[in-house]
Amino acid sequence: LSDIDIIEQIGSGNLVIDPYEEDNVEPASVDLRLGKEAKLVRSRYISGDKGIIDASEDDGSEKLMYDELEQPFIISPGTFVLTTTLERVKIPSDMVGHVLGRSTLGRLGISVHQTAGYIDPGFEGQITLELSNHGPAPVSFDPGQRICQIVFEELSSPALKPYGHEDSQYQNQSGATPSGMSFD
């Protein structure tokens, strides 16, 4: 969708971004901001001789350290952090979203997602981001700073079974949500 289409979709209530700031609308995307939560894997919770996390045991939440972000935080090289967007989004059943990194962060070696950049039709909630620092130096982040962008595409028809049905494990997620692999 173009900026005009995005603004119209939000104005009609068909697409929801909350809180919404029109200044964050770009020519064909919306910049989303860093929320106030981060979860980091604690090395003392990684078990086994080979340092393997068994994701089939549980949702992984006890392997993660929770931090409420009130001030800047630093991601060191080689670090993986689950964070969240400040905004909650609600995608209509005839649209999909794609979360992409911002080039300003990519040029510092930061990726904002590993594989989970696709947002299904019908999804509602905050978007969990999978930040990694692939660069040579630590990078500082401020809660509320623009961290990623979301691009929207209209489908030719609404999804028959949009996200949000009883098997949708991340629907209405709030905060940095760990893997639900053990529920697959």
Where are these regions (language model features)?
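DUTPase catalytic domain/fold
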Residues: 1-184
